[in-house]
Amino acid sequence: MNKGELRTHFLALLNRSDCTDALADTFIDQAIGRIRRTLRIPSMEKQQTYSVTSPGGLSKIVLPADFLEAIDTYYDGDALVRLPLHEMLAYQKTGGLGSPRYFTRELGTFYLHPQPTGGTLYLNYYSELEALVADSDINALTVVASDVIIYTALGYASDYFLDERGQLFDGKAAVFLAEVQEQADTAEQSGGTQVMRPTTTYED
């Protein structure tokens, strides 16, 4: 559904003559803001590539403007491990160069250690949802979870209008949200056998 279709369906389900289009849009925006805080689905995933050409070492990278949450970060096929900020600051004082093994986020920046001088760094992340401005606009959420948006918005509308159907709307929104997340989680695990790994390995 696009924004206009979401609004039309929302207003039909709410079935109130005192809810304007502007109010409906506010409830829909509130719903999207709430959903994005918890839902993590493949259609929200993006990849940012950083080509490193810094003879003196690259100490940090700037995160994409639509960055919401990191999935993984890797360099030359090796995943980086996240460290607490105080440990990273201690490492960075050494100024070591080489393939990065660790990262730390501070505001809109990832700090790296060791500091790479070349190669390619990859960041897989969950992105913010595109804003719905025009009635024809869609985003990753409207395509796969329009019912979650609509019923979450109906919950906000019920609070505003003191509508007794609020609990019903919230309950349906929670069920739909769980279904979408479960479908995404199942798809993530499909196609291979899950194997138990030992916590410790020993070499001869």
Model-derived features with residue positions:
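Glycine-enriched, solvent-exposed interface loops adjoining structured elements
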Residues: 1-204
